[in-house]
Amino acid sequence: MKAHDGMYIDGAWRPAASGETIDVVNPVDEQVIDRVPAGTAEDVDAAVRAARAALPGWAATPPAERAARLAALRDVLVARKVEIAETVTAELGSPLAFSQAVHAGVPIAVAGSYAQLAATHAFEEKVGNSTVYQEPIGVVG
């Protein structure tokens, strides 16, 4: 059994504020396959604060660099696709082929799509006598 004892918040791994964990059970054989932190509202608030603090830097990052970072994320997801699919299959009991196509494949496609969008989207557009700027507006959630 693996044990993941932290959540990645504000650039660091940290335990849940509660100090508690949740067993992850394989639905096929009902064996505990992992243990993860039991996140709390306090943990969510910390993550949202960290995301809000990161926004100015991300908003100031040139679109080409954002695209490169999103493409790098896509590449990591591609490299770990089998591992992700096997983990999801163990957690959910879904068929491996489905986990590869959907649970691992869709995030790869989304990250790639967003990378392409960041590289090609017109974030500044002339409309009549006006200029419309599109920029990150904030944390959702």
Residue ranges and their predicted role:
Residues A122-G141:
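Conserved small-residue-rich beta-alpha loop and adjacent elements
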Residues M1-G128:
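N-terminal Rossmann-like NAD(P)+-binding subdomain of aldehyde/semialdehyde dehydrogenases
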